[in-house]
Amino acid sequence: MDRMAGSFGSGERARKITDEPQLVERPEHPAIIELAAYLERLRGDREMPDRADIQPSEIARLLPNMIIAEAVNGGADFRIRLFGTALVTLLGEERTGKLLSEFAEESSAFSSENPEFVQRRWLFVTQRAFFGRKPVFLKVPFAASGRLYMVGHCLSAPLTAGGSEPAQTIGAMFASRVD
């Protein structure tokens, strides 16, 4: 994985991420496993699932932790169409309607790192799924006062929008406490 400095973003509850996120081959969190299986089922024999195939009622319990982003300028940036309420609580800000390139400015109030790192981190993960045309799984460590207290388990996957080319990404983050 390319080394990316900084953090995904932080808020009142998630002050700082201390280490680089780790790309993982397979998801470990039960909810990420469930979402990945759902998307794989929707994909069928196609390269990627289509946005129209998603039935929110089938994944209702996952929605608070989900994000849907629409590609802008061929994937140079992404506009957030859904930013779940659990993500708002975790990261300390509402991001629905914003571009990923706008995350940095807003996250600067919550992060001691260069705010541009926030933008680059989100773009890196989203573009990796979008241009790679397959799901990306990762783990993100969170720490406060130099102590690891939580791990974010994440998924980002491409979606088509009626065609065969990716047009959006769908993802989720679920946090688990570290004992």
Residue ranges and their predicted role:
Residues 2-9, 15-38, 42-179:
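Sensory/regulatory domains in signal-transduction proteins
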